[in-house]
Amino acid sequence: MDTMRWQDDHLLLLDQTKLPLTEEYIECWDHVILCDAIKKLKVRGAPAIGAAAAFGVALAALNYTGEDRAEFEADVKKAIADLGKTRPTAVNLFWALRRMEAVLEDIRTYSVKEQQERLIAEAKAVFDEDRAMNEQMGQYGLELIPESAGILTHCNAGALATAGFGTALGVIRAAHRAGKEISVFADETRPLLQGARLTAWELMQDGIPVTLITDSMAAYVMKQKLVDLVIVGADRITANGDVANKIGTYGVALAAKAHGIPFYVAAPVSTFDLSLESGLQIPIEERDTEEVRRVGDSITAPPGVPVYNPAFDVTPAELVTAFITDRGVFRPPYLETLRAMAETK
């Protein structure tokens, strides 16, 4: 099961809106199709969005059939701008686009064909590096997982949310591979049920014991002493350690704090936005109100009832026990340790 796969001249993208019942791939022949897929959550998860966006730039480059370098550059930069408008919160998107644009600037004197080849190679590198970072994160996170641990996770931060292996689920996978007898509670994650549809499915595919719960049950299973730690992913982390992640994460963190349970965030360095001082500066995406009025095709609320549907919330740094990254585990004080992390090679 691949989240995405480059095939010669186009991108195959697993349609996550069809999971867990149907495994169907979308053929992306241009960046416009990819923009639509990102907006509609057919691909989601900050690292996966970043990798997909890099391939979107490669598609735009490949679709140019002329030889005028200025025209080529304009086409690619338009694609970068279009991709940057798809989702505002996940910082990996902008990190990947800046990386692709930097390559474009470096090679602007090359022939169009050479530029196309370099941009495709860079997109593949973004993808491959993300997978490697996730594997590394899993190894660093192993030390934090006790034997026979009960682990609660929210949303989906697995292979589906990345280029492969996963961030939060990558740590869980690493613990499972190491022979630790762990079990997982997966919040269903309303309104789009990423925990129920994706996390539960991923863990079952890997033979990792998982129990699905509604979001409102999280505090109760903690009180019942069924949870030893919480581990989640992230869409953006600021310089002070504030964390934007799927809506509901903040509530889980508060419950973990109240019950004395460690709350860990697993994320690659590309998810850290040290240009922002705190979570107050993170733009929070608001999505279609129908996502809340419906579950799938079923209407579950009175037609026309007002809805508030932020896709993310911000968990304050003081609720985060530690960050698990591809460069190690970082603990408070985050203003110091996260800057040290950024300087680590």
Curated annotation (Swiss-Prot):
Keywords: Amino-acid biosynthesis, Isomerase, Methionine biosynthesis. The keyword Isomerase applies. Transmembrane segments: none annotated. Substrate binds at residues 44-46, 87, 194, 245-246. Its EC number is 5.3.1.23. One of its GO terms (biological process) is L-methionine salvage from methylthioadenosine. Pathway: Amino-acid biosynthesis; L-methionine biosynthesis via salvage pathway; L-methionine from S-methyl-5-thio-alpha-D-ribose 1-phosphate: step 1/6. It comes from the Bacteria. SUPFAM superfamilies: NagB/RpiA/CoA transferase-like. The record marks 155 as: Transition state stabilizer. The keyword Isomerase applies. The active site is at residue 235. It catalyses: 5-(methylsulfanyl)-alpha-D-ribose 1-phosphate = 5-(methylsulfanyl)-D-ribulose 1-phosphate. It holds the Pfam family IF-2B. GO terms for molecular function: S-methyl-5-thioribose-1-phosphate isomerase activity. Belongs to the eIF-2B alpha/beta/delta subunits family. MtnA subfamily. Catalyzes the interconversion of methylthioribose-1-phosphate (MTR-1-P) into methylthioribulose-1-phosphate (MTRu-1-P). This is Methylthioribose-1-phosphate isomerase. It comes from Heliobacterium modesticaldum (strain ATCC 51547 / Ice1).
